[in-house]
Design a protein with these regions (language model features):
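Intrinsically disordered, low-complexity interaction arms of viral/retroelements
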Residues: 1-38, 163-178
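Intrinsic disorder/low-complexity signal
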Residues: 3, 13, 18-19, 44, ...
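Compositionally biased regions
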Residues: 6, 28, 75, 153-156
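Conserved acidic
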Residues: 21, 25, 44, 54, ...
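Aspartyl protease active-site motif detector
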Residues: 30-74, 108-110, 114-122
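Generic recognition of well-structured, leucine-rich alpha-helical segments
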Residues: 59-60, 68, 79, 127, ...
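C-terminal reverse transcriptase regions that engage the nucleic-acid substrate
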Residues: 76-91
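Aspartic protease core domain of the pepsin/retropepsin superfamily
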Residues: 91-178
């Protein structure tokens, strides 16, 4: 009765605290949370079939690539990407990037779409890098070498694309595999 009367009153901008009331279900409207990554990070997304990112993400990564003198080039692509219940979004183009993954030179192909989407890489890229995530010790392993996880503000695991060999930009842990 208290909950019913509290929710049926006109808004008073007061805070009502509800504790220990069985069978109380409050649903919130669908909220959208934008994920903004620091430039140079790509999110590990096991549901992503192909690496993809929005135009703004590509512009940021290309500015950083230019500063570092690292190569990249575009190529034509004819693919569509769908996120949740939204409509399919056509790719504008694809990009080949020369990146540094945990101290190793690598390449990655990332589709560009005209949407506000962070960089996402999928299982194929992660498998190629022999990636293992360890949430217990907060590390990510690629090609047998560990480094600290770089989570997004939403706690999604991210990979830095600018950890080139012999850089001082990250803390790295070597792990001997026997």
């Amino acid at each position: 009765a208290y909950v019913d009367s509290a929710f049926n009153q006109p808004p008073t901008h007061e805070l009502f605290v509800v504790e220990d009331i069985p069978n109380l279900h409050i649903s919130f409207a669908n909220a959208t949370y934008m994920v903004n990554l620091r430039p140079g990070l790509i999110m590990a997304d096991t549901g992503c079939k192909k690496a993809v990112a929005g135009s703004e993400w590509h512009q940021e990564i290309q500015r950083k690539m230019d500063k570092k003198g690292k190569g990249y080039c575009s190529y034509p692509i004819h693919e569509y990407f769908k996120f949740g219940p939204g409509h399919p979004i056509p790719a504008v183009r694809g990009w080949n990037y020369n990146v540094g993954i945990n101290g190793f030179n690598e390449q990655i192909q990332i589709a560009e779409i005209d949407a506000d989407v962070p960089g996402l890489c999928g299982p194929d890229d992660m498998a190629r890098w022999k990636m293992k995530l360890d949430f217990e010790d907060g590390t990510i392993q690629t090609n047998g070498r560990k480094t600290l996880l770089q989570p997004s503000k939403t706690s999604h695991p991210c990979i830095c694309l600018f950890q080139f060999p012999k850089t001082e930009h990250y803390k790295m842990y070597d792990e001997h595999i026997t």
